[in-house]
């Protein structure tokens, strides 16, 4: 087995009440001015003020950038960077789901390294550590609060840039399920399927290790048991907490084993049409699993067993097929759209989408490597 590296934030706070603990632990850190990166909903709902008040109690001032939209853009990064500089912020707090986390990562990275966001597209392109970042999570899915992945939309090229860089790994991650109770069903479903995709892609990645395998399988098990409950009753705290742990486990898996064609393709859909990332993943997942099954059927069956399917006595091919069907059934049961047509994607755009997907960093570790025609066919199979 080749050598491997395991990336994770220095400190990871989990469970009810972990938000207050994490911010109290900043006492004595020397930080004076925080930039809180969030979105308008988090600000209007009072969660940004809650965090700002907790910071103030520790003697830390804060400025707020709440202009992050789903699929954060280069423009958003520049806007946040200006506020950071104007307020002499010495560290960054991201508050929300994947979009605020990714935007904050890019702000923190460019703040210390200079240049433009696009300079860091690819793997480990930065020279210096980013500004310290605390990522406070309010969704259970992206795991961006604890990864070295940062996805920013280039509005000019209409593509999502994948920045995979150890220097954007947050210093502290916070997963307090009390902050996740307010997630609507649609967001719970989309982010939960994103987490399941992380588990599947990490487990079948060419860079998988025994550590990432263990994380991926446990994540799949917990998601299968708790996602629908969390969707049906958002106030079910055991389900919310289980999903918080599950998405974190899936994050540990893909942060170190990387991903595959589902994400490489979903990034293009999100960047080109401004579609929700988790929904794109959910629609594409069964199609890419079917494509990969010719080389990793046994691994797909393993995930199915972890999800609680009675398939241990089946052959690898049959077990993989049953697992893929279970994924389809779960997605349908929580209201995920059936195909790309329902998302508004267009078949005539597929050649361009496929070309960009093959250049995405996430494509490198897919277990089955395809050419332009095969990836086009994969996209078309999802219509």
UniProtKB/Swiss-Prot annotation:
Keyword set includes Cytoplasm: no
EC number: 1.1.1.1
Family annotation (InterPro entries): ADH_Fe/GldA, ADH_Fe_C, ADH_Fe_CS, Alcohol_dehydrogenase_Fe
Pfam families noted in UniProt: ADH_Fe_C, Fe-ADH
Reaction(s) catalysed (UniProt annotation): a primary alcohol + NAD(+) = an aldehyde + NADH + H(+); a secondary alcohol + NAD(+) = a ketone + NADH + H(+); ethanol + NAD(+) = acetaldehyde + NADH + H(+)
Positions contributing to Fe(2+) binding: 194, 198, 263, 277
Cofactor: Fe cation
Annotated NAD(+) binding sites: 39, 71, 98-99, 138-139, 147, 149, 160, 179, 182-183, 267, 277
Domain of life: Bacteria
Molecular function per GO: ethanol dehydrogenase (NAD+) activity; metal ion binding
Keyword NAD listed: yes
NCBIfam families found in the cross-reference section: PRK09860.1 (NF007363)
PANTHER family the record matches: ALCOHOL DEHYDROGENASE (PTHR11496), ALCOHOL DEHYDROGENASE 4 (PTHR11496:SF102)
Remarks, miscellaneous: In Z.mobilis there are two isozymes of alcohol dehydrogenase.
Stated family: Belongs to the iron-containing alcohol dehydrogenase family.
Protein name: Alcohol dehydrogenase 2
Organism: Zymomonas mobilis subsp. mobilis (strain ATCC 31821 / ZM4 / CP4)
